[in-house]
C-alpha cells in the first residue's frame, strides 16, 4: 500500500489522529463522509434513470411524417 511505511508507523499515526480528534469527532466525520457518498450515488442513479426515461420517450417519438402515419395505421389495425 504505502511503500516504505511499516504497519507500526501506520498504527502510531492512527493513535495520534485519535488522540488529536477523539473518537466521537472521527465517528461524526466518518458518518458525514458516508452520507455524502450515499447522496452522490443516489444522485448518479437518479440521473441515469432520467436519461433512460428520456431515451425511451425519444424512441417512442416518430422520426418523420411517414413513420407517424405507419404507427397510426398500426394502432388502427390493433383496435
From Swiss-Prot:
Alphabetized InterPro entries for the sequence: TatA/B/E, TatA/E
Q: Which organism is it from?
A: Alcanivorax borkumensis (strain ATCC 700651 / DSM 11573 / NCIMB 13689 / SK2)
Superkingdom, according to UniProt?
A: Bacteria
Checking PANTHER family in the record gives:
SEC-INDEPENDENT PROTEIN TRANSLOCASE PROTEIN TATA (PTHR42982:SF1)
Q: Which gene encodes it?
A: tatA
Q: Which UniProt keywords apply?
A: Cell inner membrane, Cell membrane, Membrane, Protein transport, Translocation, Transmembrane, Transmembrane helix, Transport
Spell out the Pfam families in the cross-references. Answer: TatA_B_E
**Location within or outside the cell:** Cell inner membrane
UniProt name for this protein: Sec-independent protein translocase protein TatA
Per UniProt, subunit arrangement is: The Tat system comprises two distinct complexes: a TatABC complex, containing multiple copies of TatA, TatB and TatC subunits, and a separate TatA complex, containing only TatA subunits. Substrates initially bind to the TatABC complex, which probably triggers association of the separate TatA complex to form the active translocon.
UniProt keyword Cell inner membrane, yes or no = yes
According to the record, the residues making up region (Disordered) are 44-79
Q: What does this protein do?
A: Part of the twin-arginine translocation (Tat) system that transports large folded proteins containing a characteristic twin-arginine motif in their signal peptide across membranes. TatA could form the protein-conducting channel of the Tat system.
Q: Name one GO cellular component term.
A: TAT protein transport complex
One GO BP on record is: protein transport by the Tat complex
Q: How does the entry describe its membrane topology? A: Single-pass membrane protein
Q: Which segments show compositional bias classed as Basic and acidic residues?
A: 44-58, 66-79
Residues annotated as transmembrane: 1-21
Signal peptide residue numbers: none
Q: Which family does it belong to?
A: Belongs to the TatA/E family.
One GO term in the molecular function aspect is: protein transmembrane transporter activity
Q: What is the phylogenetic placement of the source species in the record?
A: Bacteria, Pseudomonadati, Pseudomonadota, Gammaproteobacteria, Oceanospirillales
Amino acid at each position: 500500500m504505502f511503500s516504505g511505511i511499516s504497519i507500526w508507523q501506520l498504527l502510531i499515526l492512527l493513535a495520534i489522529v485519535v488522540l488529536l480528534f477523539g473518537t466521537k469527532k472521527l465517528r461524526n466525520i466518518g458518518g458525514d463522509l458516508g452520507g455524502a457518498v450515499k447522496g452522490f450515488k443516489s444522485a448518479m442513479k437518479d440521473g441515469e434513470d432520467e436519461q433512460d426515461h428520456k431515451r425511451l420517450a425519444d424512441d417512442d417519438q416518430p422520426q418523420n411524417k411517414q413513420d407517424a402515419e405507419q404507427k397510426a395505421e398500426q394502432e388502427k389495425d390493433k383496435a
